[in-house]
Amino acid sequence: MDFVLSALQRDSWGIAAIILVSIWALHSFHRSRKLQIPVPYVGKCGILGPWISALQWESKARELVQEGYEKHGNFAFKVALLNRWEVCICNEDMIREYKNLMDNQFSAIAVTSELFQIKWTAPGTEEGAHKISIPLLGKALTWQRNRSAAQNDPYFSEFVEEFLYAWKEEVPVPENGDYELPCFETGARVVAHLTARSLVGYPLCRNPEIVNLFTDYGSAVPTSGFFIAMFPEIMKPFVANFCSAPRISKRLQAILLEEFAKRREEGGIESTDIMGWLRNWTDQNEPGVYGDLEITSSIIATIFGAIHTTTQVLVHCLFELATRPEYVEPLRVEIQSALEEHGGWVKEGIEGMVKLDSFIKECQRFNPLDAGSLARRATKDFTFKNGLTIPEGTFVFAPNGPILFDDTLYPEARQFDGYRFYNLGQKTGKPQDFRFAATNQKYLQFGDGRHTCPGRWMASDEIRLMLAHILMNYDIATKDNKGRPENWIFKKILFPDMKAVVILKARKSVSA
């Protein structure tokens, strides 16, 4: 990747590091091959086949996962990485069996810790650290979600207010003429404003440094994490000193700890945001167990997932809208109707935009972030009911991308249908099962089971609010009508073009 190459070019020790990393990777892979995992192998054949496939993983991972799903979709298969085997569990019963296991059997945080090198990029939240649990963070987000739905609670109106403030700050569209919107850059900053409002509240969310740090941290975690992961454990403390995520994390920690102290001086900590709610809930229910440091660490770790993934879905939606004009007017009609029926930009109005919700979900389905989902590491030997044993230390995942393009599950899956999920909801009489934030084993974008993404409801509100605002106030097109910007792939991950722009032009007549 570009960030890896540029990092190596900046440092005189780059060549030596590559040699050391290569030796370490070969040693690790040789050691991992001794693990006996009795599932079919997918990749190059022959004595050197696994080595070649491992070297091609960065560019061929999604193809290998698709091939494995097509050949072994009723069971499981393994693929070779430079330092280990990974096992893809395809069988529905087996997925159901492992997705709800406790972390002391199949650990999700272990995967995240290794992929993004959380020990260095989000210290205090790595595997084994004393930290706020994911279920407790989920409880906090559920509290906030319930506030959004409560008619007499000001939270959602404040959320809309924050969006309008962020849009005005970040998107200077002229009254006349075109405006080139840098989709990812601007989207990330707007989402950072909203994430800050949710996590740390007003007025801290209006602090320009906080917005900058939230935005930068969302990008720094994957780039720093991927770079640090290239090196043996003994070199990582040294390498981390050259990466931005640890520095940003340290600065955020200082600001948030200072905020706690300030709130106490000014009369106490109120439950008006996630940070305050966690402080009060833990004081009341688990006094003395968690300090300010554990709470602020959990807030910081939440930032990456909250900003980067939400922004990517938003960008895909903008690209699809700009190149599929047939959806624009019908969606505007629905948005206008929902706003009029419910009295403006209120929670009920956003929930009434069911075709817009379907369009967003189809954009996500058609451009799946990860070819896999439900990634776990076996923390002890585990035997499935069908007799397959997964050795301790093995990484497993379930197919995601291949499921979303399986014609037996999604008819004409290679065709984009913005109303696909709306129609499925109407046909089955269960519209809630097909909303953007809904999950099941046929739609694993947010995971499923024990570690389902707890922030998906907030992401849904953010994306619907932004797209509805754009549709009602602007015409949208690609630059020079050149077509949809191309996605790019790294390993199993698919990214939108992060440099691409769309053209916004203020509409002459806006009734919303």
From Swiss-Prot:
The chain crosses the membrane at residues 3-23, 35-55. It is a multi-pass membrane protein. Its EC number is 1.-.-.-. GO terms for cellular component: membrane. Pfam families: p450 (PF00067). It is found in: Membrane. This is Cytochrome P450 monooxygenase paxQ. Keywords: Heme, Iron, Membrane, Metal-binding, Monooxygenase, Oxidoreductase, Transmembrane, Transmembrane helix. It is an enzyme of class 1 (oxidoreductase). Cytochrome P450 monooxygenase; part of the gene cluster that mediates the biosynthesis of paxilline, a mycotoxin that acts as an inhibitor of mammalian maxi-K channels. PaxG, the geranylgeranyl diphosphate (GGPP) synthase is proposed to catalyze the first step in paxilline biosynthesis. Condensation of indole-3-glycerol phosphate with GGPP by paxC then forms 3-geranylgeranylindole (3-GGI), followed by epoxidation and cyclization of this intermediate (by paxM and paxB) to form paspaline. Heme binds at residue 453. The keyword Cell wall biogenesis/degradation does not apply. Disruption phenotype: Impairs the production of paxilline. Leads to the accumulation of the 13-desoxypaxillin intermediate. It comes from Penicillium paxilli. Pathway: Secondary metabolite biosynthesis. One of its GO terms (biological process) is paxilline biosynthetic process.
